[in-house]
UniProtKB/Swiss-Prot annotation:
Associates with the 50S ribosomal subunit. It comes from the Bacteria. GTP 2 binds at residues 189-196, 236-240, 301-304. It comes from Maridesulfovibrio salexigens (strain ATCC 14822 / DSM 2638 / NCIMB 8403 / VKM B-1763) (Desulfovibrio salexigens). Keywords: GTP-binding, Nucleotide-binding, Repeat, Ribosome biogenesis. Belongs to the TRAFAC class TrmE-Era-EngA-EngB-Septin-like GTPase superfamily. EngA (Der) GTPase family. GTP 1 binds at residues 9-16, 56-60, 122-125. This is GTPase Der. The keyword Nucleotide-binding applies. Residues 3-170, 183-356 form the EngA-type G domain. Coiled coil: none annotated. The keyword GTP-binding applies. GO terms for biological process: ribosome biogenesis. GO terms for molecular function: ATP hydrolysis activity; GTP binding.
Amino acid sequence: MLPTIALIGRPNVGKSTLFNRLLRKKRAITHDMPGITRDRIYAEGNYNGVHYALIDTGGLVMESDNNSEEFQGDIFEQAREAIEEAQALILVVDGRTGITQLDEQVAAYIRQSNKPILLLVNKVDGSELEATATADFHALGFEMMAVSAEHGFNLLELREKVADMALATGIEYEEEDEEAKGLKIAMLGRPNAGKSSMVNALTGEERVIVSDVAGTTRDSVDVTFESGGKIYTFVDTAGVRRRTNITDTIERFSVVRALRSSTKADITVMVVDALAGITKQDKRLLEYLLREAVPFIIAVNKIDLVSKSERNLLREGFERALRMAHHVPVVYTSCISKSGLGGILPLASKLKAECSLRISTGQLNRIMKEIIEKHQPPVVKRRRAKFKYMTQADDEPPTFIFFINDEKLIKSSYHRFLENRLRKILNVKHAPLNIVFRSTFRAKEDIVHK
């Protein structure tokens, strides 16, 4: 278990920038626009061997303000849960603007928690400004410290203070290995396809904000849970739009992280809106996942909104549209009725097992001999490819190298034949399968056919 500290405050006081500086890496999205952090974001910090969990929360707004009304209640609920989870709190305020009524309201609210609170006056760019910037905040009655997350003033002292706060909780850190997170599953798809609803339905809790406004999830949110005696971690990613539709820098950052999450996770679930069908952007996402050899499942969501009489036609349409991803499993789901959701986790586990496949060189060469004897490669320009031997170069995904006299003699149709035969013999139904042909008569870069 980790001692947990939560960053709390009104919008645009620099919580996410402080979060990143304390962690020394860019984990939360930062920008001068209120409401950027909507879900609570977790990460592990470490200073001089003191480990702790840090939670970044959305800016608390007590009254309706312009267009923030849609997220007020949800952000407040996420912050409230973070306060309950944490053993200590850091109230972040803006030293440039001075104390505001909203600061006082937030302070009054978190004081009720009876937890240790550090008042952090941010945006103080030097010691000469410290006395003036902090003067008004003494009235709040908390232990206080002045910093500048942007320019680094007092950051070393802050890291030491946060480590002291973690030690003061009395919670002893127990190191977790990657196995503690279990199977990591990234959720990927266009905005408002239902990714967050699916995470909540599968985990059984309202962990990720759900709204019918596209773009609610702007950052990757990790959710670890147990199901059927197995541990899973969902990474609920921001929706991915066409680049021409990404109108602000915030969403650009989120899209990059969403795509990165899909390649770092064990398995990706690509969520598609049943009503919208396979859009151009969905096809681009498919091409990206196939190109990167990402093991993934396609979840056609909101199937409950399609009439029963039209579902067969819808399935036929999806089958035609997904021919390029013939090996990828497709499930039809509804987060409202829970239809189809029960198959996702077992399918993800099976897909992970397929990706981890390791076959000995001896067994592979017996398989190769059997395949080639039954179906010789076609003659190309009076020459036929001669297979010398094969080996497995990697797993996750399985990658096999065929050593032949000249890789130019392999046609795409024969490559597909070899892939299909290997899938059947090795029982690799859904995982990506990389096949490399390497010429033995001269040194040359590998040519990979996926």
